[in-house]
Regions:
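FAD-binding core/adjacent interface of flavoenzyme oxidoreductases
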Residues: 1-10, 77-158, 232, 243
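Beta1-alpha1 glycine-rich phosphate/pyrophosphate-binding loop at the start
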Residues: 2-79, 158-159, 167-198
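C-terminal auxiliary extensions adjacent to catalytic cores
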Residues: 7, 339-392
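A Rossmann-like FAD-binding core segment of flavoenzymes
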Residues: 80-88, 103, 175-271
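FAD-site-proximal beta/loop scaffold in flavoenzymes
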Residues: 126-153, 236-304
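FAD-binding beta-loop-beta segment adjacent to the flavin cofactor pocket
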Residues: 265-282, 326, 342-348, 441-443
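A conserved FAD-binding loop/helix module that cradles the flavin
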Residues: 287-337
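Helix-biased detector of long, well-ordered alpha-helical tracts
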Residues: 388-742
Length: 742
């Protein structure tokens, strides 16, 4: 999944809009060998905008109306970068991201939607709630709805914008809230739904009246203060909550790009959806405007532009003539009415009824299903790299015979680019490191300390190289923390695939920067490393630490009567395995990543504070495998409470579908040490005891009289899944080391 194939060209997609989801699915079904897709989006889900009113009304759940971008990108072998774009450098073919390294591209496409634009209204920020970006609006709406549902006080809500969006949203709010709250719709036009048939306008004016929604027309908003709308006609309107559903503009980050934009900041494109400024930049949806005609912002255009965009991206890579996009002059518009009623309009015709809503519902759900119900079996296998990509460098990389030994080292040019400007935090006890490199690093070890050394490395388990670098650093440092050591230095081990130099250097740099961000926080200095070419990426670290001789936390220090505490939930193995098969929900993957990004440093400090002297980190051998390591040199047995073991969201579901990590079957052989395993071996929770963990939590023995204090302290310090999972007792049978209790 995480690009084992050769990367020659990078297609970068900004935004998970309706056009881009079509492109991503198409490349999953029919990839171009050598082209790597990367989607950058601030959220792991993409709302199908036509279903937004249905969410507000309560007709749809979150999952009903959203496309899972993690499943889609996993299906299509597309990298997913959860991030915020803050700029584009077209001259350097780079996209600048907030809080992480930039990404380079050979072809860039932008389908990230528009922003609300109310520059002419004073004091609007932090008071009014714009509908765009939609995810921010939905979280605000959820908060307000919850407030209203738990209060008897009538609330005064104002919506500004008399177009289809404003009308749909205010009628949906009425349906959701009932009649006890005051709703007002304000438009600067002399009528609502400008451009729609008279009959459609009549239907909705009548509907607003019947549902006690005030309609204020021909009002220009001058200023919005807290609780008051001030108009140019010196007529004020009071409100508790105000929503903006009208004017839009391009995002702020696009304005500093030196690309051709219109007055509202939208990207200007030609009829091939290509930027007027740069031929390797495309755009679609609400973020674009055409240079030769006006096209109103509507989801139907973005959906249909997706097909042309997909064809033109493919043709651009093959240096072929691009297709022209020809928007339809008229299209069917369906506007919902809050309840399960809707109005359909085309030309001068209008139709109203429940059947219209159910028709729209069928269309919308069908669209969502195309991108959420995916099967990897549908994908074509095409390994042949297009001739146009076969530069001298690429041809050389594809030679049958590649050297071993030192002839397989990464080129100096790759290393120089990757190691430039890494911002490594320095320690006083590092004598020679990367700032003054030599044949080896030199490190001071104080007379009263011992040196601890550990090593770990593995292939990527997620597609984002920066996140992968962070997780790998946490995982490698965890062994030191489990011993009670203070990390000191790290040396990188990196096997790099056969890609062009500039692709490799950026990939390596992203991984290193992710790791260094963690190392700097953990007071660990990167002092060197080694790179070699390989079939796929492998990455990790040899880490060293310092420890007092009398403060070593050994696995075998468990005592009779100790309570067993686990600091993190288990389940990363099965969730990551499901993600590789496009079977994991985005929220599950997000939670698993958040868990892996939590350092074990503070948890070990807390464990020591409350008398813990035995601990280990839970990694590849799973909870049972690592617990057995703690027990094997003792005369003790562990009583495990299966119901108390914390489990990551979704892990029970994925493992019950027999989606397991590669090491799972071998780990399950540890069952022979469990006294009563046959009572539980069909339970998904039992299977998770053997799930291999990446950057897992700490398992420790704590004296019984300090358990509650220890758990409270762990919870206060961000270890919210910390639980007591069992007790250690005296062993009666040599073969049995674990007993599971209900």
């Amino acid at each position: 999944m995480f690009y084992k194939k050769q990367v020659i060209k990078d297609l970068l997609l900004i935004g998970g809009g309706h056009s881009h989801i079509k492109v991503i699915k198409s490349f999953g079904m029919n990839p171009i060998p050598g082209v790597r897709l990367t989607l950058i989006n601030p959220d792991m889900y993409s709302l199908y905008s036509g279903m937004l009113p249905g969410i507000i009304s309560g007709h749809y759940s979150f999952d009903d109306a959203h496309i899972d971008l993690i499943k889609l990108t996993s299906y299509s072998n597309c990298r997913f970068i959860k991030g915020k774009v803050i700029g584009i450098q077209p001259g350097d073919n780079r996209v600048i991201l907030e809080g992480r390294p930039p990404l380079s591209y050979d072809l860039l496409s932008i389908n990230s939607g528009s922003s609300s634009n109310y520059k002419e209204i004073e004091d609007i920020d932090n008071i009014a709630i714009p509908v765009k970006p939609i995810n921010n609006f939905l979280s605000q709406w959820k908060y307000i709805k919850n407030k209203i549902d738990n209060s008897k006080k009538e609330r005064n809500i104002v919506v500004i914008g008399g177009g289809a969006g404003g009308v749909e949203i205010i009628t949906a709010m009425r349906h959701s809230l009932g009649e006890k709250n005051s709703l007002t719709l304000i438009t600067k036009e002399n009528k609502i739904l400008s451009g729609f048939p008279k009959k459609t306008i009549h239907y909705f004016e009548d509907h607003l009246k019947k549902n006690k929604i005030k309609l204020i027309k021909e009002i220009e908003i001058k200023k919005i203060t807290k609780g008051k709308v001030i108009s140019t006609k010196e007529k004020d309107f009071l409100f508790d909550d105000i929503f903006l559903v009208a004017q839009t503009a391009g995002p702020q980050w696009l304005k500093g790009s030196n690309l051709s934009l219109n007055d509202e900041g939208f990207l200007l494109v030609n009829d091939k959806l290509q930027s007027l400024s740069k031929e390797n930049i495309f755009g679609s949806g609400d973020i674009i405007d055409f240079d030769n005609y006006n096209l109103k912002k509507a989801g139907v255009y973005a959906v249909r532009q997706g097909d042309v965009l997909n064809k033109n991206i493919r043709k651009y890579f093959q240096n072929k003539i691009l297709h022209k996009y020809k928007p339809q002059k008229n299209f069917l518009s369906i506007i919902t009415m809050g309840s399960k009623n809707a109005v359909a309009s085309k030309y001068s015709l209008s139709f109203k009824g429940k059947w219209v809503w159910y028709w729209k519902n069928y269309i919308d759900k069908n669209f969502i299903a195309k991108f959420n119900n995916l099967s990897i079996k549908d994908m074509k296998i095409n390994e042949r790299i297009p001739k146009i990509f076969l530069t001298k460098e690429v041809k050389k990389l594809n030679e049958d015979i590649r050297c071993g030994g030192c002839g397989a080292k990464a080129a100096r040019e790759i290393l120089n680019l990757a190691l430039d400007d890494l911002n490594i935090k320095k320690r006083d006890d590092i004598v020679i490191g990367l700032d003054n490199p030599d044949d080896a690093s030199i490190i001071k070890i104080p007379n009263d300390k011992l040196s601890t050394i550990s090593l770990d490395f593995f292939p990527p388990m997620i597609s984002d190289p920066y996140l992968f670098g962070q997780i790998t650093a946490h995982h490698c440092l965890s062994d030191l923390y489990a011993m009670g050591a203070e990390p000191q230095s790290a040396m990188a081990i990196s096997c790099l695939p056969l890609w062009p130099k500039h692709k490799l250097s950026e990939e390596l740099k992203s991984m290193l920067l992710g790791s260094i961000q963690v190392f700097n926080n953990e007071n660990t200095q990167l002092v060197g490393g080694h790179t070699s070419e390989a079939e796929q990426c492998i990455y990790g670290f040899s880490v060293t630490g310092l420890i007092n001789k009398d403060k070593i936390l050994s696995k075998s220090n468990l005592k009779k009567g100790d309570a067993l505490i686990l600091t993190k939930a288990i389940g990363t193995g099965t969730i990551l395995a499901a993600n590789m098969r496009a079977k994991a929900n985005a929220s599950w993957v997000d939670n698993a990543i958040e868990s892996m990004l939590v350092s074990n440093r503070m948890s070990v400090d807390i464990i020591k504070k409350y008398g813990g002297i035995a601990c280990t980190d839970i990694t590849g051998f799973g909870l049972i495998g690592h617990l057995l390591e703690m027990l094997e040199r003792t005369q003790l047995i562990a009583n495990l409470n299966l119901e108390n073991i914390p489990i990551l969201d979704g892990a029970d579901e994925t493992i019950s579908k027999k989606i397991i990590s590669t090491l799972q079957d071998n780990n399950e052989k540890f069952s022979r040490y469990i006294k009563n395993y046959s009572e539980f071996n069909k339970s998904p929770n039992y299977k998770l005891l053997f799930d291999p963990q990446t950057a897992g939590g700490i398992l420790a023995g704590i004296p019984e009289d300090h358990v509650d204090e220890c758990l409270n302290d762990l919870t206060k310090n961000n270890y919210t899944n910390a639980r007591r999972i069992g007790t250690v007792e005296e062993q009666t049978n040599k073969e049995e080391k674990i007993y599971i209790i209900k």
